[in-house]
């Protein structure tokens, strides 16, 4: 159970962190252009 939970959290962070980074980068480029 514990290992599964840790793996789930790790995979969730592995997906969320780059996604948030790309969104922030995308918003930043849009603001600078406009």
UniProtKB/Swiss-Prot annotation:
InterPro entries, alphabetized: PSII_PsbM, PSII_PsbM_sf
SUPFAM superfamilies: Photosystem II reaction center protein M, PsbM (SSF161033)
Domain of life: Bacteria
Entry keyword set: Membrane, Photosynthesis, Photosystem II, Reaction center, Thylakoid, Transmembrane, Transmembrane helix
Coiled coil: none
GO cellular component: photosystem II; plasma membrane-derived thylakoid membrane
A biological-process GO annotation: photosynthesis, light reaction
Topological type in the membrane: Single-pass membrane protein
Family membership: Belongs to the PsbM family.
Quaternary structure, from the entry: PSII is composed of 1 copy each of membrane proteins PsbA, PsbB, PsbC, PsbD, PsbE, PsbF, PsbH, PsbI, PsbJ, PsbK, PsbL, PsbM, PsbT, PsbX, PsbY, PsbZ, Psb30/Ycf12, peripheral proteins PsbO, CyanoQ (PsbQ), PsbU, PsbV and a large number of cofactors. It forms dimeric complexes.
Name of the featured protein: Photosystem II reaction center protein M
Species name: Parasynechococcus marenigrum (strain WH8102)
